Amino acid sequence: MIDIGAAALNEALIAQSIRPLFSRALASGRPIYLANHSLGRPPDRVVEDVQRALDAWYRDMGEAWDEWLAARDRFRALTAQLVGAPSGDSVIPKTSAGQGLRAVLNLFDAPIRVLSTDSEFDSIDFILRVYRDKGRIELTTVPARAEALIDAMHAGPPQLVVVSTVLFRSGEIVAGIEDVVRSARAAGASVLLDVYHHAGVLPLDLAALDADFAVGGSYKYTRGGPGACWLYVHPRNHSRRTLDTGWFAKDDPFGYERPDPPRFAPGGDAWMESTPPVLAPVQALAGLEFTNAIGAVRLREYHLAQKERFAAQLAQRGLRVEGAGPQFGAFLSLAHPEATRLSAELMRRGVKTDARGDRLRLCADLLNTDDELAAASQAVAGVLDKA
């Protein structure tokens, strides 16, 4: 899809080789888009890919499954490459990260102790609280710090630890996540990492981290839209059985045999469920190929420099933001009690941002120009002056 060699990214190279791949998303008249940490901007090729999958349906009807399943397997392989999974069969397509979490929670036959943090994304937090209220888990939450998690493990060993590697409100990277995983494994606990704000903007090697599970998706930084999510299952857990299953987890889904006990597919395919959505993996392919072609290391180098320039422009206007340093992920954030209202006012001024709680979140990416960031800085300053 893209071949720009190994050169460091710069605005001239991006204008020549990358922006033309996004002509639809960059059409004139659009707001300055600084919500790249939320819904990523898709490559033009997404339209062609989805149309091809639909054409197969119209043309081939039931035989379209061959093409759809090939696209699904391509999605799994590309995601494995992105996150450092040992093979594509360790990546289980899901429609949401929450669906992946439920599959892991439903591994356990009896109520279990779950350790998490007070900084998880709303869906993860909500699911854990519902499982707690249903008597399915005992839930302990601590601050999102490695020391707090490890201390809590020593106080009462959990069966499952659920923690983000990058926090969704502030973009802060949770330092010492390797120590958390090691301590959990030593205590006999499984670990599920939420890497949604990590994959695609920071180098990631799940195999090296040795986490049991991880959840993420293509909605944000890999530009694949909603529904193209996944659960990573470490190979040592391929033989474990969750209640979240279905006929695609059988050893021969289209054989229609019913052995008793059920026979599961080999490897990670045993974690599949029932009939999957077919367009979500298709719509994610172009963005995954694009991200892998550039590489997380090169993207991170560019984004760090870009964040620092953006933060400096805001600082020149008297605005203090968090997130510019290497201890943060992809976006800047500005603490303000009326962050949601500020985001709405910025949209009226032609700058698309978002807010989570008291945080106004601002995320440039390689499609944003320095001129756009200068204009956005002026708009943010104007909105705050008015406030």
Question: Where do the language-model regions lie?
Answer:
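Pyridoxal 5′-phosphate
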Residues: 1-387
